[in-house]
């Protein structure tokens, strides 16, 4: 489930700081800090500030939190243990998985998909084009003979769906009987049909295979014409299927069928001799083929066209498919767009996409090349498009910086509803869920995405409440949990490690897709994906646990409890860093994140700082003004924190130098100096987020000069992120038990919620849109990551955050 709840540490006050206005604060003591900053370039910088203690209640010792017991492979927490090359899990196995997946992604071609007995049978029915009394594709007939299941049926051996098994089996029996071969196999197939036909009456109509009510009656008619005995043609369920087809055909506008590509073309083999449609106009229909010669990528429909017209383009398509699948044929082909989109989506959600960046770029470049103003379909160059592939394209292409507009979604909107494609009988959860996911990556003013978000959220919420989540396109036991989590954890509040942990536990290796027959796609559902995800997660988690021990040691050595920082504050800070920047090689950035956030929090909450005047700088460093009679103790506290502060900055610099091989001392000093100056000016809205983001980017090697920090786009991002996070912090400091409920209720009506939403949309646009003015994608992404952690804290209640922390950082992946 989305809550990821197993352990429940008591984080009753996870953000244990108390806001005190500047007018209410008292300053019992001040201490002049005159520090010398020595850089590796031997430059000496003098830094003089006046530091005063605020009279603030220290809540660090209040309450109690039981941290999970952590068992590590290496109990030592030496600096070397924090490096990426530490001896963790089976590196060789990870490399093996990575090679396997790289090879798969690099050889996608038109996509991998399992064979459909139904479509293969239609191809086997094609007579020799030259007029001889032999099959044009004998290898297809051979495939049928070699792939009958032990119970006499044809279909997916591991999963029984009555629609699928009966349709496949009837088609194969018709093909074998037509050519008068393998009578024994035909008899076994007929017996299976006879014994199982009644199961159609109990089958879920939501999972009826595509076009079943159109193509199954056509096959029954063909079987009857061939004189196949033993099939219960007059059974009540059979009569109901024929009646359903008649009702559907009466609603079909004949002129539309021959004018534009519609879903009916996909079931063309079921439209012959339909009274309501009359005779098919083949000269018009042949103009509706795809460039590859198929009818909406259906081998069965294309095989029927070959039988009726001997069209050379259709025949070329069938030849291509049969050669590709050694006599067999899938239910749709190609699936080049679909395979690439869903493979990238799975790799990202499993948290392993960083291993395949070149391959992912190639996949998305390919999809972008075939993007149209109407959207896309599962195969390239198709005039017929659907909302599922179009939504996934919008989301993934936009997240990776491609210039993509969502206006294609207008083609799937009618009145106030969105549909998978024109002519869809009823909507199904999985395409609408992908529409919902795409709708969250919206830019300001994109009304179509706002409408899509509202519709999809309400549609899915209603289905969840009714427990009505059977899907027309996908059979997955994890789909309900996936949808539930998607609604409970909006994209703005989603942290990469939280999403990965959830998806690892819910990734469907055995998911089955529904077409005219059931099919599987190895590039989407592969156990090697899951194996690599688990190995990598364990590796990252072990690294994070080592770092957590290091952070705790820093906490103890620095006596941070004395400055109002509790261990739960520390754990929350580390969790947010590790859940956002999780890669083992980015240890320095995580540690910089935590230490910077803790120190800036102490400085803004418990001290008042201003730059020393010239007269104050001339005073002795030991001068003390005891305003409240407790000066000596205060002086000691201040001096100790100054030592901790500069020592921690030195550690951050040293870690960064080891990681990126650069001296960042000047840059780091400069951003902290600027921030302290602003803090000293008494600004009510302290720009901690700008300081945090700049520290992370500098430690990651993304900022090499001060010019970046003064760049206009960088300043715009800083101002906007500071504003968003300041507003989110105000929400976060409200009544924590009610905040999540109020957020959901008020975000579309209350002004502050609306303002946050609009600002987040603008931030997403600034971060995701490509810019050629010197600000790298890595730099911009850090702003979004930081903003999402604040959104996460404001959105989720403390107990749920505690569950996430336990699950993500401490509980092992099984």
From Swiss-Prot:
Keywords: Chloroplast, Isomerase, Magnesium, Metal-binding, Plastid, Transit peptide
E.C. code: 5.5.1.14
GO terms of molecular function: magnesium ion binding; syn-copalyl diphosphate synthase activity; terpene synthase activity
Cofactor: Mg(2+)
Annotated pathway: Secondary metabolite biosynthesis; terpenoid biosynthesis
Plastid listed as a keyword: yes
Organ and tissue specificity: Mostly expressed in trichomes of leaves and fruits.
GO cellular component: chloroplast
Binding site for Mg(2+): 386, 388
Alphabetical list of InterPro entries matching this protein: Isoprenoid_synthase_dom_sf (IPR008949), Terpene_synth_N (IPR001906), Terpene_synth_N_sf (IPR036965), Terpene_synthase-like (IPR050148), Terpenoid_cyclase/PrenylTrfase (IPR008930)
Places the protein is found: Plastid, Chloroplast
One record GO biological process: gibberellin biosynthetic process
Motif (DXDD motif): 386-389
Top enzyme class: isomerase
Catalytic activity: (2E,6E,10E)-geranylgeranyl diphosphate = 9alpha-copalyl diphosphate
Function description: Involved in the biosynthesis of labdane-type diterpenoid including cleroda-dienols, and peregrinol lactones and furan derivatives, dopaminergic diterpenoids that can bind to dopamine receptors in the human pituitary gland, have probably ability to lower prolactin levels, and are used to treat menstrual cycle disorders (e.g. premenstrual syndrome and mastodynia). Terpene synthase that produces syn-copalyl diphosophate from geranylgeranyl diphosphate (GGPP).
Family of this protein: Belongs to the terpene synthase family.
UniProt comment concerning the protein's domains: The Asp-Xaa-Asp-Asp (DXDD) motif is important for the catalytic activity, presumably through binding to Mg(2+).
Protein's name in the database: Syn-copalyl diphosphate synthase TPS3, chloroplastic
Species: Vitex agnus-castus (Chaste tree)
